Structures are given as structure tokens and as C-alpha cells.
């Protein structure tokens, strides 16, 4: 019990020291600036692979449902319009959009490394290569996951006696979120992060993210004060609030993984000191 209280105390101290609520606000601002360029790049990548044409709609639904609960239809229409407008841009404009998308990834990189108190920097070409891989391979991995889930779901629906399998598939969004957070916590920090600590932090973040999404959607539908106050503009503050909460959950999971590593490191040091005194 004492160790658990100590762990919670350390976690809360680190959460406040790193000013993660302010960091979530900064990432929210960066996300709002980069969301259209990022989505444009993602769907441009998908258009280059005809095999993903059938799952593009499913991917849109996945993105909008997770990042704009209760307003996904409206946000989807706006994003589609913005992306269509971006297709008329010149090469210089497209490059600038890609740069903005990469800047968001850079912001995430610096924020997560500050949680692990890592001040080292990667060479600029290495950083660019990593960011570009995240920007290109990330959507492809998500698309592959959605395509595989859709294929398996079709198999279960066409076969009798597989209702249990369909119920299991309902956990795919949660498991996908857990997997994505785990990979982020392992790959982005410059320090080596164990898969055990990454998975533990990612699990908590995924639980908060999933429950928070449902609670947020319920609140917006049950207490439609934003719609009454802002009218047609209600989508913007709703989306801002949810992105802020989402980043708070992500950073909370990252801080948990970092504290787990910190506590383990301190235990190892204490054990070594005990061994030396024997």
C-alpha cells in the first residue's frame, strides 16, 4: 500500500512538474493547424494504393469518430471540403502542407521527450526520416488493420455460429488504440523504453481515451449547451475540447510509462547499494 501511495505521489508530482495540461493545450493548437494537411497527406497516400480504396471510408469514419465524437458527420464534411480544395494547390502549397504536418509530429516528439527528461537531439536527417516514416507507414498500418478487420467481419457474418467472434471484433478499436499508443511511447522518445512500461502506460491511456470518448459524446448529446450558445459554430469548440482531452490522456499514459521506468531504476540503484554494504 505504501509503495502504491508513493508511486501515485511521484506520478502526480511529475505530471505537474512537466505541466502536461499546458502541453496538451499546445498540442491541441498544433493539431488544429495541422489536421487538414495531415489528413490530406494520409488520404493522398491511400489513393496511391488501390487496394485501400474500399477501406478509405472506414478509415474516415475511424478518424472522425475518435477525434470528433458526436460531431463526426459535420467535421467529416468540412474536412472533405478542405481536402478537395487542397487538390487545387500548387506544388509549393502542397510542400508547405506536408511541412506543417511534419511540424505536428515534431511537437509530439519534443513533448514526449520532455516527459522522459531527455534533452538529447537526433540528427536532423534522422529526425526527418523517422517523421516521414510515421507519416507514411502509420496510415498504411491503420488501413491494413481496418481492411483485415473488415475481411474477418465479413467471414463471420457469412458463417453461422460465429456471434462470439463478432463480439470480439467490437474490441478491435480499443486494441488498435492500445497498440498505437504503445508504439508511440516506444518509438518517439530518444530514450529506450521497455515494451512492458510502454504497454502499461498505453493501456491506461487507451482506457481513458475510450471511456472519455463515450462520456464526452453522451455529455454533448444530453446537455447541448454548446449548440444553444454557438449555433452552427458549435462544432469548433466541441472539437477543440475533445482534442484537448485526447492529448491529456495520451500524455497521462506517457507520464505513467516514464514513472514506471523511474521507479524501477531507483529500485535497482537501492538494490545495488544494499549489495555493496553486505
From Swiss-Prot:
Provide one Gene Ontology cellular component: plasma membrane
Q: Which InterPro entries match?
A: UPF0761_bac, Virul_fac_BrkB
Q: Give the source species.
A: Aggregatibacter aphrophilus (strain NJ8700) (Haemophilus aphrophilus)
UniProt keyword Membrane present: yes
State if Transmembrane is listed as a keyword.
yes
Question: Taking the first listed entry, what is the main subcellular location of this protein, grouped into a coarse class?
Answer: membrane
One Pfam entry name: Virul_fac_BrkB
| Name the record gives this protein | UPF0761 membrane protein NT05HA_1801
| Membrane-crossing residue ranges in chain numbering | 32-52, 88-108, 123-143, 168-188, 203-223, 232-252
Taxonomy, superkingdom: Bacteria
Q: What's the protein's topology in the membrane?
A: Multi-pass membrane protein
UniProtKB keywords: Cell inner membrane, Cell membrane, Membrane, Transmembrane, Transmembrane helix
Which compartments does it reside in?
Cell inner membrane
Amino acid at each position: 500500500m505504501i509503495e502504491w501511495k508513493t508511486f501515485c505521489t511521484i506520478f502526480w508530482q511529475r505530471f505537474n512538474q512537466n505541466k502536461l495540461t499546458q502541453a496538451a493545450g499546445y498540442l491541441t493548437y498544433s493539431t488544429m493547424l495541422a489536421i487538414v494537411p495531415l489528413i490530406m497527406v494520409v488520404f493522398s497516400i491511400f489513393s496511391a494504393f488501390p487496394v485501400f480504396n474500399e477501406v478509405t471510408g472506414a478509415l474516415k469514419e475511424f478518424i472522425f469518430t475518435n477525434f470528433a465524437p458526436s460531431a463526426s458527420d459535420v467535421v467529416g464534411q468540412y474536412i472533405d471540403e478542405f481536402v478537395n480544395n487542397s487538390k487545387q494547390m500548387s506544388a509549393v502549397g502542397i510542400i508547405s502542407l506536408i511541412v506543417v504536418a511534419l511540424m505536428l509530429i515534431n511537437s509530439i516528439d519534443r513533448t514526449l521527450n520532455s516527459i522522459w527528461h531527455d534533452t538529447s537531439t537526433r540528427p536532423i536527417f534522422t529526425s526527418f526520416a523517422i517523421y516521414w516514416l510515421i507519416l507514411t507507414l502509420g496510415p498504411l498500418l491503420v488501413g491494413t488493420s481496418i481492411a483485415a478487420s473488415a475481411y474477418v467481419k465479413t467471414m463471420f457474418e457469412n458463417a453461422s455460429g460465429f456471434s462470439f467472434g463478432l463480439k470480439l471484433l467490437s474490441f478491435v478499436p480499443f486494441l488498435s488504440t492500445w497498440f498505437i499508443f504503445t508504439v508511440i511511447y516506444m518509438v518517439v522518445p530518444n530514450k529506450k523504453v521497455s515494451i512492458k512500461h510502454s504497454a502499461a502506460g498505453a493501456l491506461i491511456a487507451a482506457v481513458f481515451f475510450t471511456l472519455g470518448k463515450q462520456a464526452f459524446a453522451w455529455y454533448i448529446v444530453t446537455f447541448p449547451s454548446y449548440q444553444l450558445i454557438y449555433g452552427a459554430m458549435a462544432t469548433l469548440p466541441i472539437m477543440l475540447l475533445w482534442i484537448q482531452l485526447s492529448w491529456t490522456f495520451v500524455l497521462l499514459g506517457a507520464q505513467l510509462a516514464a514513472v514506471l521506468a523511474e521507479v524501477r531504476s531507483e529500485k535497482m540503484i537501492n538494490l545495488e547499494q544494499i549489495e555493496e554494504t553486505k
